[in-house]
């Protein structure tokens, strides 16, 4: 049997039932195609969600009341500008400028005060008092933007035992052109790249219990891997749930994440975020004109975007690389990148993640806590769809949470902490074996 990875397809349970299993050949538009068997009403919902995902929002007041309310402070004016073709963002644009897909998250260490504990319970972090939880690089008329992100890299050589050398780019992040005063010296800057919107309907169908079944916080099996779930606040449940989305698994549902992105990236209000993204010291932001409607993104539009993202096909993924798959297992990669889950509707999905948090070492620490995720802890990145990313974004792919890795090989070499043994084992492979493993990953 040559094929070792099954075709990726999405089955999403909605109120109307179960959609037919469908997939599409990897291409530039591979992440943007909808199911062919949607009903007329479902097509309307899908297209409504797609339109509000793609159209640019405008500042208030505007005659276009259906999509006004942008800002006053914001990073981008549409979802698609950070997720081109529904794929991930890049560090730089084709013109060499820092992409809008790169955002700077800001936070300070929590203390025992009631205010800080309330932040930690509902947001999972404590924002900077002046600049909030995320730097805004744009502002509407008469509202100064907060600042700009500056990235510099230092090339660090890594030598394999066989003498081969690979250079890693070590990033340094700085905020410049700050318009609201100096940044607090205790504020951490965590830079994140917009992720690809792959298989969100699948992830939604993985139960909390299925994820928790793989927890091993105390490493009772003594394999050096101690994954833990992130218990996070759910706006929908008004209580705690297992986080599945974002780089630190800090969000429990797709709809929660959509609302967070609207608030953080565009300062658009929803039922989950009722106020603009202004801090108490930003008077121009607080006094800026408001949209006609109290809620910029009403429930029906929020629901439509949620539906749109859950009814997208997944590119066909097959691998015939038996050697690469065997090495992936032998090195222990599959201990965290668990190949498959069974969903609530009994479909087995090949996702290559456990959705748990793992200590990835000091080199990848971003100084930021999100709920139970500590500074050097990250959610295991799902590996599905790698083979389609370059076609979808039209350029070379940047890997890891901040895009520092320019190749899958570099991404592996950044692994530390719980993944250090696997990385060291990879480094001791022959060049041909390393290439075989990387080829396998590139076909997922």
Where are these predicted regions, by residue range?
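An amphipathic alpha-helix signature
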Residues: 251, 255, 409-413, 438
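Post-cleavage N-terminal segment of exported redox proteins
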Residues: 19-65, 86-90, 255-322, 339-342, ...
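Short glycine/threonine-rich turn/loop motifs
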Residues: 21-240, 244-247, 314-406, 410-413
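Short helix/strand-capping connector loops at secondary-structure junctions
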Residues: 411-424
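Sec-dependent signal peptide recognition
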Residues: 2-10
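Hydrophobic h-region of N-terminal signal peptides that target proteins for export
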Residues: 12-20
């Amino acid at each position: 049997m040559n094929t070792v990875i099954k075709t990726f397809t999405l089955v999403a349970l909605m109120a109307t039932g179960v959609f037919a299993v469908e997939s599409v050949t990897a291409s530039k538009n591979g992440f943007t195609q909808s199911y062919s068997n949607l009903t007329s009403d479902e097509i309307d919902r899908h297209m409504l969600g797609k339109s509000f995902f793609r159209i640019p929002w405008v500042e208030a007041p505007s005659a276009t009341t259906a999509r006004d309310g942008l800002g006053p402070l914001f990073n981008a004016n549409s979802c698609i500008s950070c997720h081109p073709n529904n794929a991930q963002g890049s560090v730089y644009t084709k013109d060499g400028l820092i992409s809008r897909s790169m955002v700077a998250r800001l936070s300070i260490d929590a203390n025992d005060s009631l205010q800080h504990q309330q932040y930690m319970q509902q947001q999972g972090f404590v924002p900077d008092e002046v600049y909030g939880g995320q730097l805004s690089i744009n502002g509407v008329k008469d509202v100064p933007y907060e600042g700009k992100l500056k990235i510099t890299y230092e090339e660090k050589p890594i030598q394999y035992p066989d003498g081969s050398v690979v250079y890693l780019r070590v990033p340094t992040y700085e905020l410049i052109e700050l318009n609201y005063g100096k940044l607090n010296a205790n504020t951490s800057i965590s830079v994140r790249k917009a992720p690809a919107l792959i298989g969100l309907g699948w992830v939604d169908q993985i139960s909390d219990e299925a994820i928790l079944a793989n927890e091993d916080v105390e490493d009772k099996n003594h394999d050096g891997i101690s994954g833990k779930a992130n218990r996070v606040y759910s706006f929908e449940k008004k209580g705690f749930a297992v986080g599945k989305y974002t780089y630190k698994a800090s969000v429990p549902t797709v709809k929660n994440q959509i609302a967070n992105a609207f608030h953080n990236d565009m300062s658009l209000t929803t039922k989950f975020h009722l106020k603009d993204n202004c801090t108490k010291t930003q008077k121009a932001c607080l006094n800026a004109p408001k949209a006609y409607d109290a809620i910029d993104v009403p429930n029906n539009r929020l629901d439509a975007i949620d539906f749109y993202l859950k009814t997208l096909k997944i590119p066909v993924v097959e691998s015939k690389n038996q050697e690469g798959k065997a090495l992936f297992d032998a090195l222990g990669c599959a201990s965290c990148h668990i190949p498959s889950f069974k969903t609530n509707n009994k479909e087995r999905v090949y996702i290559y993640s456990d959705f748990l948090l793992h200590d990835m070492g000091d080199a990848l620490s971003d100084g930021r806590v999100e709920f139970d995720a500590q500074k050097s802890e990250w959610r295991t990145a799902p590996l599905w769809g790698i083979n389609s990313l370059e076609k979808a974004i039209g350029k070379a792919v940047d890997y890891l949470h901040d895009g520092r890795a320019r190749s899958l090989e570099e991404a592996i070499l950044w692994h530390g902490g719980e993944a250090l043994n696997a990385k060291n084992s990879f480094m001791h492979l022959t060049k041909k074996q390393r290439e075989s493993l990387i080829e396998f990953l590139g076909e997922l």
